[in-house]
Amino acid sequence: MARSIWKGPFVDLHLLRKAEGAQDSGARAPIKTWSRRSTILPQFVGLTFNVYNGRKFVPVSVSEEMVGHKLGEFAPTRYFPGHADKKGKR
């Protein structure tokens, strides 16, 4: 079920403050975050976030198409190496 419209999008307050500070100062350094659950807002466009995937920080550059999605959607947590090839099928 989707989040109710009257509540608005969820963004961790500390992340919102860091993003606003980076926009005001014009800093190009990536913002390090563990908050995969935060929604990407229009004011995040152009910023780079280092999102933790459980093992390392994955750089995520925010573009217009990402607005409304969660930060965690762009930092995969699982690695799929592919299915093994069959020995008889070459």
Curated annotation (Swiss-Prot):
Pfam families assigned to the protein according to its UniProt record, in alphabetical order: Ribosomal_S19
Family affiliation: Belongs to the universal ribosomal protein uS19 family.
Protein name (Swiss-Prot/TrEMBL): Small ribosomal subunit protein uS19
GO cellular component assignments: cytoplasm; small ribosomal subunit
Gene: rpsS
InterPro entries: Ribosomal_uS19, Ribosomal_uS19_bac-type, Ribosomal_uS19_CS, Ribosomal_uS19_SF
Coiled-coil zones: none
Alphabetical GO biological process terms: ribosomal small subunit assembly; translation
SUPFAM superfamilies named among the record's database cross-references: Ribosomal protein S19
Species annotation: Rhizorhabdus wittichii (strain DSM 6014 / CCUG 31198 / JCM 15750 / NBRC 105917 / EY 4224 / RW1) (Sphingomonas wittichii)
GO terms, molecular function: rRNA binding; structural constituent of ribosome
Function: Protein S19 forms a complex with S13 that binds strongly to the 16S ribosomal RNA.
Keywords, in A-Z order: Ribonucleoprotein, Ribosomal protein, RNA-binding, rRNA-binding
